[in-house]
């Protein structure tokens, strides 16, 4: 450190010192930070963290952290008040990033909406949090699981599947979302 990385919006971001406190405004980035083993560095997480089963099983302490909102209603002031060394947000918050930076926050945007994007997010977050070895292990585990799954279903007819949305059974993942790759 200082370390310059390129986030998933193509922005060059310089992280001046190794981040010791993180804020994640996106459940996918929060989940990846757990997988990278840096959940203890989180000081703020996305809304509804207290309802996520994954967190209750893998990092229950996250359920009591302050909420920094959602991609639709991000709490800029609340996030800034936590003084995180690094903030991770979904790419859809790109219009809010300049304001966050004006508030003195270092911000990375992630867009893990397909397999390449997921691996890019893992690599970006692993690099930013100095956990590249763990990031490589995580990618290899995912690749291994996907290969085993492909082998297990080889030669079978793929069924039509409707994946109900998180908020409503009448909503589903669009073509640009990771879930559509399943």
Please provide the spans of the model-predicted regions.
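Short, surface-exposed amphipathic charged segments that create phosphate/polyanion-binding patches used
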Residues: 58-59, 122-126, 178
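Extracellular/periplasmic catalytic domains that process cell-envelope and extracellular macromolecules
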Residues: 15-17, 37, 60-61, 80-81, ...
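Residues at the C-termini of beta-strands that transition into short coil/loop
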Residues: 9, 46, 69-71, 111, ...
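N-terminal hydrophobic or amphipathic helices and topogenic motifs
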Residues: 1-16
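A short, structured surface patch at a secondary-structure boundary
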Residues: 24-82, 86-92
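Alpha-helical, coiled-coil/dimerization segments enriched in small aliphatic residues
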Residues: 172-182
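Extracytoplasmic substrate-binding proteins
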Residues: 12, 96-173
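Short periplasmic/luminal acceptor-recognition loop of GT-C membrane glycosyltransferases, typified by
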Residues: 21-25, 161
């Amino acid at each position: 450190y200082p370390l310059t990385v390129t986030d998933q919006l193509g922005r060059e971001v310089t992280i001046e010192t190794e981040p010791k406190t993180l804020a994640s405004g996106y459940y996918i980035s929060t989940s990846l930070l757990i997988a990278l083993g840096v959940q203890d560095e989180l000081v703020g997480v996305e809304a509804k963290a207290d309802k996520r089963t994954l967190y209750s099983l893998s990092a229950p302490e996250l359920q009591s952290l302050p909420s920094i909102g959602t991609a639709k209603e991000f709490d800029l002031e609340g996030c800034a008040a936590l003084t995180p060394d690094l903030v991770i947000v979904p790419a859809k918050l790109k219009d809010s990033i300049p304001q966050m930076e004006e508030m003195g926050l270092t911000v990375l945007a992630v867009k893990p909406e397909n397999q390449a994007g997921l691996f890019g997010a893992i690599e970006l977050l692993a690099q930013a949090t100095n956990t590249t070895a763990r990031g490589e292990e995580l990618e290899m585990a995912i690749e291994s699981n996907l290969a085993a799954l492909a082998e297990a279903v080889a030669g079978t007819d793929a069924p039509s599947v409707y994946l109900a949305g998180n908020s409503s059974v009448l909503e589903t993942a669009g073509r640009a979302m990771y879930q559509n790759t399943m």
